[in-house]
Amino acid sequence: MIGKLKGTIDEIGEDYVLVDVHGVCYVAHCSARTLSKLGSADEACVLFIETYVREDQLKLFGFMTALEREWFNLLQSVQGVGAKVALAVLSTLTPGELANAIALQDRAAVSRAPGVGPKVAMRLVTELKNRAPAFAGEAINIALKQELGEGVAAAPVADAVSALTNLGYSRDQAANAVAAAMKTAGDDADSAKLIRLGLKELAR
């Protein structure tokens, strides 16, 4: 199984990139969002890979982050969602936007993806409602670590973000407020303090 490709870009197609790894070229099917973030021919390229093996074919799907790859697999756990539709969803929504849509049961946001009709959108937001928070929380933690550094205490941060979203704020609003609170309170702040400071940020 191939988990990651590191090489140079040989060619970028409509829905794939050809990655040259020491003279061997691999075709990795990607979302439009991933393809837009890649460079040009002969530039370095790193992709997280999901390998599909079927009786008559082997396909590689490439992602910029491991989190995007996890969402790709989670989406396909829903009936009626295959690799093509999962890539279409990830082309339309970022992992954070997708988490928000599921948390808010926003079928309209999900149905913007090509190939996602009302029934599939309903199944996606309904069936993933109780399974997506872990992915959303991981996305928030990654974003906060990038913003604040590796010293972020994951549990208080996740608890604070969860509390603010339960009060009706979007995950993006909550994450931004907690990030600002962390800068004021410090890395060792508990969740109660982060919630209090986060609410002050949101009230501005």
From Swiss-Prot:
Residues 65-143 are annotated as: Domain II. It comes from the Bacteria. Residues 144-151 are annotated as: Flexible linker. Residues 152-204 are annotated as: Domain III. Residues 1-64 are annotated as: Domain I. GO terms for cellular component: cytoplasm; Holliday junction helicase complex; Holliday junction resolvase complex. InterPro entries: DNA_helicase_Holl-junc_RuvA_I, NA-bd_OB-fold, RuvA, RuvA_2-like, RuvA_C, RuvA_C_sf. GO terms for biological process: DNA recombination; DNA repair. GO terms for molecular function: ATP binding; four-way junction DNA binding; four-way junction helicase activity. The keyword DNA-binding applies. Pfam families: HHH_5, RuvA_C, RuvA_N. It is found in: Cytoplasm. Keywords: Cytoplasm, DNA damage, DNA recombination, DNA repair, DNA-binding. Gene3D superfamilies: 5' to 3' exonuclease, C-terminal subdomain, DNA helicase RuvA subunit, C-terminal domain, Nucleic acid-binding proteins. Homotetramer. Forms an RuvA(8)-RuvB(12)-Holliday junction (HJ) complex. HJ DNA is sandwiched between 2 RuvA tetramers; dsDNA enters through RuvA and exits via RuvB. An RuvB hexamer assembles on each DNA strand where it exits the tetramer. Each RuvB hexamer is contacted by two RuvA subunits (via domain III) on 2 adjacent RuvB subunits; this complex drives branch migration. In the full resolvosome a probable DNA-RuvA(4)-RuvB(12)-RuvC(2) complex forms which resolves the HJ. This is Holliday junction branch migration complex subunit RuvA. It comes from Rhizobium leguminosarum bv. trifolii (strain WSM2304).
